[in-house]
Amino acid sequence: MNLKIFSLLILTLGSFTAYSIEKRKKFNIDNGWTIELPKNWIEERDEVDRHHVYYPPNSDLTIRVSSFHIFKDLENDSEILASIDDLSESFDKSVKNIELKNNKKLEEKELNLNNFKIKDFKLKCYEYDYYEDNEKTYSISCGIMTEGYLLIINFYSALRDEVENAIKYIYSVEKIN
Protein backbone atom coordinates (compact mmCIF):
# COMPACT_ATOMS: atom_id res chain seq x y z
CA MET A 1 0.00 0.00 0.00
CA ASN A 2 2.82 2.43 0.85
CA LEU A 3 4.43 1.71 -2.51
CA LYS A 4 1.22 2.78 -4.30
CA ILE A 5 1.09 6.04 -2.37
CA PHE A 6 4.78 6.66 -3.03
CA SER A 7 4.29 5.96 -6.75
CA LEU A 8 1.34 8.35 -6.89
CA LEU A 9 3.39 11.02 -5.12
CA ILE A 10 6.28 10.62 -7.58
CA LEU A 11 3.87 10.80 -10.53
CA THR A 12 2.27 13.98 -9.15
CA LEU A 13 5.65 15.61 -8.49
CA GLY A 14 6.82 14.67 -11.97
CA SER A 15 3.78 16.32 -13.55
CA PHE A 16 4.24 19.47 -11.48
CA THR A 17 7.95 19.63 -12.30
CA ALA A 18 7.28 19.20 -16.02
CA TYR A 19 4.78 22.08 -15.91
CA SER A 20 7.03 24.37 -13.88
CA ILE A 21 10.05 23.85 -16.17
CA GLU A 22 8.04 24.22 -19.36
CA LYS A 23 10.28 26.16 -21.74
CA ARG A 24 8.89 29.65 -22.16
CA LYS A 25 9.63 32.57 -24.42
CA LYS A 26 9.03 36.23 -23.64
CA PHE A 27 7.12 37.87 -26.49
CA ASN A 28 7.31 41.65 -26.92
CA ILE A 29 4.07 43.53 -27.43
CA ASP A 30 3.74 47.20 -28.36
CA ASN A 31 4.13 50.00 -25.80
CA GLY A 32 6.52 48.10 -23.53
CA TRP A 33 4.30 45.12 -22.65
CA THR A 34 5.54 41.51 -22.66
CA ILE A 35 3.92 38.12 -22.19
CA GLU A 36 5.55 34.73 -21.58
CA LEU A 37 4.17 31.78 -23.52
CA PRO A 38 5.47 28.29 -24.27
CA LYS A 39 8.45 28.40 -26.60
CA ASN A 40 6.77 26.36 -29.33
CA TRP A 41 3.88 28.82 -29.74
CA ILE A 42 3.54 30.68 -33.03
CA GLU A 43 3.39 34.47 -33.17
CA GLU A 44 1.78 36.40 -36.02
CA ARG A 45 0.82 40.01 -36.59
CA ASP A 46 -2.63 40.73 -38.00
CA GLU A 47 -1.88 43.10 -40.88
CA VAL A 48 -5.35 44.66 -40.84
CA ASP A 49 -5.85 45.63 -37.20
CA ARG A 50 -2.24 45.18 -35.98
CA HIS A 51 -3.15 42.70 -33.21
CA HIS A 52 -0.51 40.28 -31.98
CA VAL A 53 -1.82 36.73 -32.46
CA TYR A 54 -0.41 33.72 -30.57
CA TYR A 55 -1.38 30.07 -30.79
CA PRO A 56 0.06 26.66 -30.00
CA PRO A 57 0.59 24.16 -32.82
CA ASN A 58 -2.20 21.60 -33.29
CA SER A 59 -4.68 23.45 -31.11
CA ASP A 60 -7.85 25.45 -31.49
CA LEU A 61 -6.67 28.04 -28.95
CA THR A 62 -5.87 31.59 -30.10
CA ILE A 63 -4.74 34.58 -28.07
CA ARG A 64 -5.15 38.05 -29.63
CA VAL A 65 -3.42 40.97 -27.92
CA SER A 66 -3.87 44.70 -28.57
CA SER A 67 -2.00 47.52 -26.88
CA PHE A 68 -3.09 51.14 -26.71
CA HIS A 69 -1.33 54.28 -25.45
CA ILE A 70 -4.16 56.69 -24.67
CA PHE A 71 -4.23 60.37 -23.80
CA LYS A 72 -7.08 62.52 -22.53
CA ASP A 73 -7.59 65.96 -24.07
CA LEU A 74 -7.84 68.91 -21.72
CA GLU A 75 -9.70 72.17 -22.32
CA ASN A 76 -6.50 74.18 -22.84
CA ASP A 77 -5.53 72.07 -25.90
CA SER A 78 -3.07 70.01 -23.89
CA GLU A 79 -3.32 66.36 -23.04
CA ILE A 80 -2.52 64.04 -20.17
CA LEU A 81 -2.28 60.28 -19.90
CA ALA A 82 -5.74 58.72 -19.59
CA SER A 83 -6.56 57.61 -16.06
CA ILE A 84 -7.01 53.98 -15.13
CA ASP A 85 -10.71 54.65 -14.46
CA ASP A 86 -11.19 56.20 -17.94
CA LEU A 87 -9.48 53.21 -19.54
CA SER A 88 -11.57 50.79 -17.51
CA GLU A 89 -14.75 52.53 -18.66
CA SER A 90 -13.59 52.37 -22.31
CA PHE A 91 -12.77 48.68 -22.00
CA ASP A 92 -16.16 47.94 -20.42
CA LYS A 93 -17.97 49.75 -23.25
CA SER A 94 -16.00 47.96 -25.97
CA VAL A 95 -16.56 44.50 -24.49
CA LYS A 96 -20.23 45.14 -23.82
CA ASN A 97 -20.67 46.10 -27.50
CA ILE A 98 -19.81 42.54 -28.56
CA GLU A 99 -22.90 41.14 -30.24
CA LEU A 100 -24.00 37.94 -28.55
CA LYS A 101 -26.97 35.95 -29.78
CA ASN A 102 -29.60 33.95 -27.91
CA ASN A 103 -29.84 36.59 -25.16
CA LYS A 104 -26.47 35.54 -23.76
CA LYS A 105 -24.85 37.85 -21.26
CA LEU A 106 -21.26 38.69 -20.54
CA GLU A 107 -20.11 37.46 -17.16
CA GLU A 108 -17.36 39.22 -15.29
CA LYS A 109 -14.55 36.81 -14.40
CA GLU A 110 -12.47 37.26 -11.25
CA LEU A 111 -8.73 36.54 -11.30
CA ASN A 112 -6.26 36.51 -8.43
CA LEU A 113 -4.67 39.96 -8.60
CA ASN A 114 -1.87 38.92 -6.22
CA ASN A 115 -0.30 36.82 -8.98
CA PHE A 116 0.44 39.80 -11.27
CA LYS A 117 3.87 41.34 -11.75
CA ILE A 118 2.45 44.76 -12.73
CA LYS A 119 2.33 47.72 -10.33
CA ASP A 120 -0.56 50.19 -10.04
CA PHE A 121 -2.94 48.49 -12.41
CA LYS A 122 -6.55 47.50 -12.80
CA LEU A 123 -7.80 44.31 -14.41
CA LYS A 124 -11.21 43.42 -15.77
CA CYS A 125 -12.10 40.16 -17.46
CA TYR A 126 -15.31 38.96 -19.08
CA GLU A 127 -16.21 35.52 -20.34
CA TYR A 128 -18.74 34.69 -23.02
CA ASP A 129 -19.44 32.31 -25.86
CA TYR A 130 -20.77 32.88 -29.36
CA TYR A 131 -21.20 31.09 -32.66
CA GLU A 132 -18.91 31.68 -35.62
CA ASP A 133 -19.51 29.69 -38.82
CA ASN A 134 -21.94 27.46 -36.88
CA GLU A 135 -19.22 26.57 -34.38
CA LYS A 136 -19.45 27.53 -30.74
CA THR A 137 -16.50 29.61 -29.56
CA TYR A 138 -15.67 30.25 -25.92
CA SER A 139 -13.83 33.45 -25.04
CA ILE A 140 -12.36 35.39 -22.15
CA SER A 141 -11.51 39.05 -22.77
CA CYS A 142 -9.24 40.82 -20.29
CA GLY A 143 -8.21 44.45 -20.05
CA ILE A 144 -5.13 45.42 -18.08
CA MET A 145 -4.99 49.14 -17.37
CA THR A 146 -2.15 51.31 -16.11
CA GLU A 147 -2.10 55.08 -16.37
CA GLY A 148 -2.19 55.91 -20.10
CA TYR A 149 -2.01 52.29 -21.28
CA LEU A 150 -4.59 49.63 -22.04
CA LEU A 151 -3.65 46.06 -22.93
CA ILE A 152 -6.49 43.86 -24.18
CA ILE A 153 -5.95 40.10 -24.21
CA ASN A 154 -8.58 37.87 -25.81
CA PHE A 155 -8.49 34.10 -25.40
CA TYR A 156 -10.55 32.06 -27.92
CA SER A 157 -11.20 28.37 -28.52
CA ALA A 158 -13.99 25.95 -29.34
CA LEU A 159 -12.92 24.15 -26.17
CA ARG A 160 -13.73 25.91 -22.91
CA ASP A 161 -11.01 23.95 -21.07
CA GLU A 162 -8.33 25.29 -23.43
CA VAL A 163 -9.28 28.88 -22.68
CA GLU A 164 -9.56 28.34 -18.94
CA ASN A 165 -6.16 26.63 -18.90
CA ALA A 166 -4.54 29.38 -21.00
CA ILE A 167 -5.72 32.18 -18.72
CA LYS A 168 -2.70 31.38 -16.50
CA TYR A 169 -0.47 33.09 -19.08
CA ILE A 170 -1.99 36.45 -18.22
CA TYR A 171 -0.02 36.35 -14.96
CA SER A 172 3.23 36.54 -16.94
CA VAL A 173 2.32 39.93 -18.47
CA GLU A 174 4.74 42.71 -17.57
CA LYS A 175 4.96 46.41 -18.35
CA ILE A 176 8.61 47.25 -18.99
CA ASN A 177 8.59 51.06 -19.12
Regions found by a protein language model. Name each.
Residues 46, 133-136, 159-164:
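Solvent-exposed loop/turn segments connecting transmembrane beta-strands
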Residues 41, 147-177:
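Surface-exposed amphipathic alpha-helical segments
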Residues 139-149:
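A short, solvent-exposed beta-edge/loop patch
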